[in-house]
UniProtKB/Swiss-Prot annotation:
Binding-site list for [4Fe-4S] cluster: C12, C94, C193
Cofactor info, note text: Binds 1 [4Fe-4S] cluster per subunit.
Binding locations of isopentenyl diphosphate: H40, H72, H122, S221, N223, S264
Class of enzymatic activity (EC top level): oxidoreductase
Highest classification ranks of the organism: Bacteria, Bacillati, Chloroflexota, Dehalococcoidia, Dehalococcoidales
Gene for this chain: ispH
Taxonomic source organism: Dehalococcoides mccartyi (strain ATCC BAA-2100 / JCM 16839 / KCTC 5957 / BAV1)
PANTHER family: 4-HYDROXY-3-METHYLBUT-2-ENYL DIPHOSPHATE REDUCTASE (PTHR30426:SF0)
One function term, GO molecular function aspect: 4-hydroxy-3-methylbut-2-enyl diphosphate reductase activity
Functional note: Catalyzes the conversion of 1-hydroxy-2-methyl-2-(E)-butenyl 4-diphosphate (HMBPP) into a mixture of isopentenyl diphosphate (IPP) and dimethylallyl diphosphate (DMAPP). Acts in the terminal step of the DOXP/MEP pathway for isoprenoid precursor biosynthesis.
Active site location: E124
Protein's name in the database: 4-hydroxy-3-methylbut-2-enyl diphosphate reductase
Pfam families, sorted: LYTB
Recorded superkingdom: Bacteria
């Protein structure tokens, strides 16, 4: 049984940067609170907790004088409230998310209605919507635009950073088809994360060459679920968070296994899965 990892695996640039910032802050101050989970990966959060990093869900739950913003970012109203309380803010927002926030603000300042291709319940998308100044919506269904009777003639379109590129392309085409009948002006910003795009391409290429594909990452991680959906189109694929979730009956008749991971999956977790597979292979 041969095991091969995708060429793009482990922490992405944005997560690696956020963790470095948080580890440094926690080390210097003996701990720090984050507004929302830094990343959607429980193993990483457990390790950070051991360093004195505490997750708070609401601003009112902050007990210290320093708070970290997660890699998913926040909207301007949240930033203003944090500043009004005199809190020192440690911003770990991913630069690619920041770019999407800037695009939304640019649309808003130009008088454009912002349409985000993304999950309206995801913290990243909530933050981006905030920068649209309340003049926007998020949806994964382009037909949702039909529900807005007085849709602006001026429409700006962008994407949640972790979405699948082909999905965003299809979404944009559908929005254009709907908007042109309204004599609209449309602006499109490519806000997809380059790392995620490369990771998806590498995973898809590997999935086409193996009998079984394993995606390692948090079950509530958007970019990890997208990898799962993508790999499933070409190979038998399962999502696992740790080696303990791997089921041996998946391996029956399998000679080649491919491994990829979500952008917030750490090297230790990946190594544990690979080691477990090696032990199973040696005992076969």
């Amino acid at each position: 049984m041969k095991v091969e990892c995708a060429s793009n695996i482990g922490f992405c640039f944005g997560v690696h940067r956020a963790i470095n910032i948080l580890e440094k802050t926690a080390s210097e101050r003996g701990g720090v609170e984050t507004l929302g989970a830094l990343v959607h990966n429980q193993q990483v959060l457990n390790r950070l907790s051991g360093m004195g990093v505490r997750v708070v869900k609401n601003i009112d739950d902050i007990s210290g004088r320093t708070v970290a913003i997660s890699s998913h970012g926040v909207g301007p109203a949240v930033l203003a409230e944090l500043k009004s309380k005199g809190l020192e803010i440690v911003d770990t927002t991913c630069p690619f998310v920041k770019r999407a926030q800037v695009a939304a603000k640019r649309f808003h300042d130009a008088g454009f209605f912002t349409v985000i291709y993304g999950d309206v319940n995801h913290p990243e998308v909530k933050g981006i919507l905030g920068w649209a100044g309340g003049n926007g919506l998020a949806t994964l269904n382009p037909q949702g635009l039909d529900d807005i009777p007085d849709l602006s003639r001026y429409i700006g379109v962008l994407s949640q950073t972790t979405q699948i590129p082909t999905g965003f392309t299809s979404f944009v085409k559908n929005v254009i088809d709907q908007a042109l009948v309204k004599d609209a002006e449309i602006r499109i910003a490519d806000t997809l994360c380059h790392d995620i795009r490369d990771r998806q391409a590498a995973a898809l290429e590997l999935a086409g060459r193996v009998d079984l594909m394993l995606v390692i990452g948090g079950h509530n991680s958007a970019n990890t679920r997208h990898l799962l959906d993508l790999c499933k189109t070409v190979s038998n694929t399962h999502l696992i968070e740790t080696a303990s979730e791997l089921q041996t009956d998946w391996l029956k008749g399998v000679s080649r296994i491919g491994i990829t991971s979500g952008a917030s999956t750490d090297e230790t977790t990946i190594s544990e899965v690979c080691s477990y597979l090696d032990r199973l292979s040696a005992g076969a």
